[in-house]
Swiss-Prot record:
This is Chorismate synthase. CDD domains: Chorismate_synthase. Its cofactor is FMNH2. HAMAP family: Chorismate_synth. One of its GO terms (cellular component) is cytosol. One of its GO terms (molecular function) is FMN binding. Its EC number is 4.2.3.5. Pathway: Metabolic intermediate biosynthesis; chorismate biosynthesis; chorismate from D-erythrose 4-phosphate and phosphoenolpyruvate: step 7/7.
């Protein structure tokens, strides 16, 4: 319970941060889809620890192992099982935290729910769990790209109080990945990197905002009322570790506008299936259904909860204790969270694509 996501394009992740391996079982992927395995590994490399001086120093190569579901790079329509082995576990780093509830971690709430919790690395609450999501999301991205040329681009918009403004018309994956913080504005990226390093040296951390743009979105994805596309996107993205906020389109800023300013008027077209709007305050979704415009979202991530400063907390007996984290951690999660955001968006869109085809493509 709680480890599966999706209806038709369904993922189930498994494993803990300091266990033997982490992975995913992807069920419902259409057969005969050609998969570039190198692209899956590339997404895992973008997510892996130890990739720069502003990420956790945990040294994992995150080499992908595909156990089932593919034959010579072609999907069989059967469950696709993928796994990455953990090779640099150091559970001893957490020996002083046994039965201690770290502030703003899942230790306390896991203990309250289950009466027991993983003693090291956060267990299932660790960002290491997202390896399975990223692997499955890489397949979803290829499905969407092959069928509709859909492109999902996420980048770091803000770190702490350092914000960026990006020309979305010129945005590319190579530009996003051109620096270690994954902000396509090089001048702002340099300031972000400096801030992260300063906080890291002080034993502290920071959060920020990731922005996501989806191009070439098929119209008609999503369902009314309880299965609205933006509702499922919100659930997917808010399920990522450290997320605390979600906006789509104009978001909260839209509340400052009048209806006459906010409405997205349609443009006359000879092809009703390719309607465009003058503005895109709706963020590509109206009535819970995609309208074919770009989907635009922002996701807020809190500061990394594991910090190098001494803090007061309590243990499993409710007694106050002083603690100082020794484990390896990211001073800011956002640079590595970018491919996680991409993957969750891809999984939602792939799932809704299959749902749409199942309901609306039988009778022409």
């Amino acid at each position: 319970m709680g480890s599966s996501f999706g209806k038709n394009f369904r993922v189930t992740t498994f494993g803990e941060s300091h266990g033997g391996a982490v992975g995913v079982i992807l069920d419902g992927c259409p057969p005969k889809l050609k998969i570039n395995i190198d692209l899956i590994q590339n997404e895992l490399d973008r997510r892996r620890p130890g990739q720069s001086k502003i990420t956790t120093p945990r040294n994992e190569d995150d080499k992908l192992e595909i156990l089932s579901g593919l034959k010579e790079g072609i999907t069989l329509g059967t469950p696709i099982a993928m796994m990455v082995r953990n090779k640099d576990q150091r559970p001893g780093d957490y020996s002083n935290l046994e039965q201690v509830f770290r502030p703003s971690h899942a230790d306390g709430t896991y203990h309250l729910k289950y009466g027991i919790q993983a003693g090291s690395g956060g267990g299932r609450a660790s960002a290491r769990e997202t390896i399975g999501r990223v692997a499955a999301g890489a397949i979803a991205k290829q499905l969407l790209k092959n069928l509709f040329n859909t492109e999902i681009l996420s980048w770091v918009k803000r770190i702490h109080d350092i914000d960026s403004q990006v020309n979305k018309n010129k945005l590319t994956l190579s530009k996003i990945d051109s620096n270690i913080v994954r902000c396509p504005d090089d001048k702002v990226a340099a300031k972000m990197i400096k801030r992260i390093k300063e906080l890291q040296q002080d034993g502290d951390s920071c959060g920020g905002v990731i922005e996501c743009l989806v191009k070439n979105v098929p119209s008609g994805l999503g369902m009314p009322v309880f299965d609205k596309l933006e509702a499922d996107l919100a659930k997917a993205l808010m399920s990522l570790p450290a997320t605390k906020g979600f906006e789509i389109g104009s978001g909260f800023l839209g509340t400052y506008l009048r209806g006459s300013e906010h409405n997205d008027s349609f443009i006359e077209s000879d092809d009703i299936s390719k309607l465009k709007t003058i503005s895109n305050n709706s963020g590509g979704i109206q009535g819970g259904i995609s309208n074919g415009e770009n989907i635009e979202m922002k996701i807020a991530f809190k500061p990394t909860a594991t910090i190098g400063k001494e803090q007061k907390t309590v243990n499993a007996d409710g007694k106050e204790v002083l603690m100082k984290a020794k484990g390896r951690h990211d001073p800011c999660v956002l640079p590595r969270a970018v491919p996680m955001v991409d993957s969750m968006v891809a999984l939602v869109l792939a799932d809704h694509l299959l749902l749409h085809q199942a309901q609306c493509s039988i009778i022409k």
